[in-house]
Amino acid sequence: MSSSSRGPGAGARRRRTRCRRCRACVRTECGDCHFCRDMKKFGGPGRMKQSCLLRQCTAPVLPHTAVCLLCGEAGKEDTVEGEDEKFSLSLMECTICNEIVHPGCLKMGKAEGVINSEIPNCWECPRCTQEGRTSKDAGEGPGRRRADNGEEGANLGGGWKLTEEPPPPPPLPRRKGPLPAGPTPDDVPGPPKRKEREGGNEPPTPRKKVKGGRERHLKKVGGDACLLRGADPGSPGLLPPRVLNPSQAFSSCHPGLPPENWEKPKPPIASAEGPAVPSPSPQREKLERFKRMCQLLERVPDTSSSSSDSDSDSDSSGTSLSEDEAPGEARNGRRPARGSSGEKENRGGRRAIRPGTGGPLLSWPLGPAPPPRPPQLERHVVRPPPRSPEPDTLPLAAGSDHPLPRAAWLRVFQHLGPRELCVCMRVCRTWSRWCYDKRLWPRMDLSRRKSLTPPMLSGVVRRQPRALDLSWTGVSKKQLMWLLNRLQGLQELVLSGCSWLSVSALGSAPLPALRLLDLRWIEDVKDSQLRELLLPPPDTKPGQTESRGRLQGVAELRLAGLELTDASLRLLLRHAPQLSALDLSHCAHVGDPSVHLLTAPTSPLRETLVHLNLAGCHRLTDHCLPLFRRCPRLRRLDLRSCRQLSPEACARLAAAGPPGPFRCPEEKLLLKDS
């Protein structure tokens, strides 16, 4: 029964969370790995969105939303005291089928489960163990990390096998001396081949019941014990789920044998003592080779298949997985190694080793063979060809060139508006390329458009305008960030009426040439948002020693209709010292203390302010009017719609304004001729 038929969500993996207790979780970023270099705090672009390599949790836990697949409840191990009861009520995740269940909810009599001792709440559930399903690679699964010396660290700690049956009889004792030259096959039987099972006296067993028919026991897995097969040729041997490699396991069992006898497999020689293995017919051999080839072809394209499917195929194929295996080698139980290195031999399915000539055939399951990798194709970066330079002359239909050069045509195009330029771009390809010149597009107006399409954004970038009006548009943060990163020469930007969600893109886009910024009537702007906009960027690139704010070079700032307080004005005076025009109209929190901050002796705007708009600020009174005499360069002061300001006080200020008198074309509007 497959995992897909066990209920909805049976095979869905739960993303584990940090334990927040291990050494990797409590440390800080290293700042040197490629993930740290990508982070914005270390000067990177921030595209990978990954944490530091040294901060990867070594014991991730299940999320708090994980529940049992059978009863639908969370883990309740904290409500009991005994170890067995805690284990029965805790949630366990299977590494094969990814099911999360309580061990007590599984109603299985004769079954075993292998607990992973490194990762919490992780095991191989009894259902998968009973069906004979294993992981794709038993040596590289979760919790089986290799140590620095090349050995598997999980083998030192070991796992536990849980069962309800009595333990089997003890295994054969380890031999101390050299093996006899000619033992009978009943002493240490080799692995039963598929053809031998079909042609022998024993009835064939189902493929998935090979591992499920083992005798279960409760045994600590670990140490250097090498378990061979029992005396009963029908029962497969019990092996620990993790071994170091074939050479180490064999040397620990038989220390008296020289390495040259067991490192390289040799073909067995038929002896008179042992019975001969019956050879299959040529038709059956062709059928077996065809089945193996079909299995290999099915595995090559399906690299992302589930572990249960690949393991069942590996178990059913036995020891005959090689496509180019000779018939004689298949009958004698020998399979050529896939590679010369010990790692490839360790990752193989079953490995047959003959210690000496005429010796017994020893075999142990080292895990199923992984599916072969698909052929890797060469990858090349395909870049578009460079654009050819623009022609200096206009080719005519007759084959000659127009007498006017490109510079003369551009001077003619400068007298045309945007609509006429778009018409000229449709005349010919040469005019279309000439009309993209940025001198023809000093200002582009896209205001009051509900949405901006990608062709519109691409057209703006190709024209490189100096002033861009995006007021009252539905531009998104991603679109605005894409635009600003490609308009480094932008001097004027109008974003009035947009949402702060999109305007917040200004915090991550460099605008070195910006001189005018219009942020009037932006929704949901508080002191915290304005502080984020005014403060220097936290991701200063390496080599930049000065911490300049984003608005250091801005000369005109329009903040009408925002909820600004005196704290925001202090930040404004500190991080925007070059302002000559400031619009604070209709700001409800601006009053007499705000005017005192703007005109204080320590204020940098006292000497640079030329235009000041305070229209609609209802908290201003007549007491703040004498403070404006501190600004010697003030040429325009707009106090219209200020309810608490009297016209007589404004007239007295206009008559005695420094260094000369103001004129009042309208009530509460003070102008001075330069």
UniProtKB/Swiss-Prot annotation:
Residues 133-149 have a biased composition (Basic and acidic residues). GO terms for cellular component: SCF ubiquitin ligase complex. GO terms for biological process: proteasome-mediated ubiquitin-dependent protein catabolic process. It comes from the Eukaryota. Disruption phenotype: Deletion of the CXXC zinc finger domain of FBXL19 leads to mouse embryonic lethality. GO terms for molecular function: unmethylated CpG binding; zinc ion binding. Keywords: DNA-binding, Leucine-rich repeat, Metal-binding, Repeat, Ubl conjugation, Ubl conjugation pathway, Zinc, Zinc-finger. Zn(2+) binds at residues 68, 71, 94, 97, 102, 105, 125, 128. Coiled coil: none annotated. It holds the Pfam family zf-CXXC. Residues 398-444 form the F-box domain. A zinc finger (CXXC-type) spans 12-58. A zinc finger (PHD-type) spans 65-131. Zn(2+) 1 binds at residues 19, 22, 25, 57. Acetylated by CREBBP; leading to ubiquitination and subsequent proteasomal degradation. Directly interacts with SKP1 and CUL1. Interacts with RNF20. Substrate-recognition component of the SCF (SKP1-CUL1-F-box protein)-type E3 ubiquitin ligase complex that plays a role in different processes including cell migration, cell proliferation or cytoskeletal reorganization. Mediates RHOA ubiquitination and degradation in a ERK2-dependent manner. Induces RAC1 and RAC3 degradation by the proteasome system and thereby regulates TGFB1-induced E-cadherin down-regulation and cell migration. Also mediates ubiquitination and degradation of IL-33-induced receptor IL1RL1 and subsequently blocks IL-33-mediated apoptosis. This is F-box/LRR-repeat protein 19.
